Amino acid sequence: MSEEESKTKVVILTRSYRIKGYIHLQPGARVTDFMIDSKNFMAVTNVEVWDLGGRQIMTSPFVNVSRDHVEIITPDTA
């Protein structure tokens, strides 16, 4: 992460998983801008992956999430 980027905590929902982690945004950028600019995959750091039943199935310092599988992405305010 460069000094110009800031971490934003997000929740990502796919058909199978709830993913919590951080995306790295340029100053002034929105989550919407991040999604528009993403290619096939988006980098997420400090990740927790949960199944839809609420069971945590993995943690990882980094994952690439397929943009095509993202149904909802929202800032995590919890």
Mark where each language-model region is:
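Conserved RNA-binding domains used in RNP assembly and mRNA/RNA metabolism
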Residues: 1-78
